[in-house]
Amino acid sequence: MKKIGVITNREKDKGLKYTNQLVESIEKHGGQAVLPTYDGSFQMDDIDNQVVEICNNCDMVICLGGDGTFLRTARTAYLYGLPMLGINLGSLGFLTDVEKGEIDKAVENILNNRFCLEDRIMLTSKLYKDGKLIARDVAINDIVISRGGIPRILHLSTYIDNNLVEMFPGDGIVVATPTGSTAYSLSAGGPIVEPTSGLILITPICPHILSSRALITSDMRKIKICVSQGFEHKATVTVDGQKNLEITGGDYLEIEKANSTVKIIRVNSKNFFTVLRSKIYERKEE
C-alpha cells in the first residue's frame, strides 16, 4: 500500500474541499493518506515543519496550492528523496502538474503506477563575507542578487570557472535552473529552456549596458558573482523567492549544481511545449 503525504496551503483551500477530495481518492484507490497535525492556525512557514513530520512515514508527497507552495514543500521533501506531485490551486501553476478537476484520475494513475518521474537539477549557493562562508542554501528555481529597495546601480562581476564573463551594472542578476527558466528569469528577458536540460541560466536584471544579454552555460560549470567593493548599501540575495539574505560590497556568491535533485511526478500526457503554450502564450488572467 502506497503511503501518500498530503500538504495543503490552507489559504488556497480554506474549506479543505480539494484536500478532502484528494484524501477520499487516495483511500478509494487503495492508498493511505498521511496528513500533518493541525493546530487550527496556518502560516506558510508551517509547511516546513509539516513536511518534516510526514516525510518519514510516506512514499511520496502531494501538495495542494500554487507554485510557491510546491517550492516550499519540495525544498524540504528532496532531503528525503521523495517524489512530489503538485495540484494547482493557484493561477499559473507551472510546477503543479494537476488541475483541480483532475485529482481523482491523477491519484488512480499514481496508485496503478501509471506515471513518470522527472529529475530536476537544483543549485547550491554559498555566501561569503570577508572571505568567510556565512550561509549556504539550495534553489529549485533561482537565486537572485538584486538591489532590493535601494535606488542605486548594483555592479556585479560574474565569473564562470574563475573566468570573468562580464561586469553587469544594473538591478541585479538571476541565476536559474531550467525549471526556473519560466519564472523570474523569463520576466527579466531570459530564454525558456526545457526543464530537464543540463543547463544554468544567467540573466541580468535591467542591465545598464547595451551589450548585456542573458547567457546559458553547462550545469557542470561553477559560477561566482562578486559585489563591487565600492557598493556601500545593502543588496539582497533571494533563494526561490522565499529566503532572503543581505549582501554588500566585497561579498560574493558561489553557485553550482547541487548533488541532489528534485523528483517530480508527471501523470499528464501533456508535454512541456503544450504546457508552455497554455501557461504562457495563451494565458488568460483571471
From Swiss-Prot:
Subcellular location: Cytoplasm
Cofactor(s) it depends on: a divalent metal cation
Entry's Gene Ontology BP terms: NAD metabolic process; NADP biosynthetic process
UniProt cross-references to InterPro entries, sorted A to Z: ATP-NAD_kinase_N, ATP-NAD_kinase_PpnK-typ_C, NAD/diacylglycerol_kinase_sf, NADK
Enzymatic reactions: NAD(+) + ATP = ADP + NADP(+) + H(+)
Pfam families: NAD_kinase (PF01513), NAD_kinase_C (PF20143)
GO CC terms: cytoplasm
Known EC number: 2.7.1.23
Entry-linked SUPFAM superfamilies: NAD kinase/diacylglycerol kinase-like
Family: Belongs to the NAD kinase family.
PANTHER family reported in the protein's UniProt record: NAD KINASE
HAMAP family named in the record: NAD_kinase
Name listed for the protein in its UniProt record: NAD kinase
